[in-house]
Design a protein with these regions (language model features):
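Thiamine diphosphate
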Residues: 1-97
Length: 97
């Protein structure tokens, strides 16, 4: 069972500023609590690949983002991950469920 409050506390401890991704049924509870949270901004994308490009830009702008996607979405995001985060050497943390 997903315990959103514990995950959010861990994100705060790591000073995560943004959570970028595509909500799904498994992450719904976490997204709902993040939307009510005032220290972490939620940025939704229509595809998982967009999340890596957007999170990379946020990092370059001084933010500390986390990518939150479902496991099948990571396959869709492969080229975007390689083309931005990996090739540019951007240290992004991903929570893939």
């Amino acid at each position: 069972m997903l315990q959103a409050n514990k995950i959010i506390a861990a994100l705060e401890k790591q000073e995560i500023t943004h959570v970028v991704g595509v909500p799904d049924n498994g992450s719904r509870t976490l997204y709902e609590q993040l939307w009510a949270h005032d220290k972490i901004e939620v940025v939704l994308t229509s595809r998982e690949g967009e999340a890596y490009g957007l999170a990379s830009g946020l990092y370059l702008g001084g933010a500390n983002p986390l990518v939150l996607i479902q496991n099948t979405g990571f396959f869709e995001a492969g080229d975007a991950f390689r083309g931005t985060a990996y090739n540019m050497g951007i240290p992004l943390v991903s929570l893939i469920g």
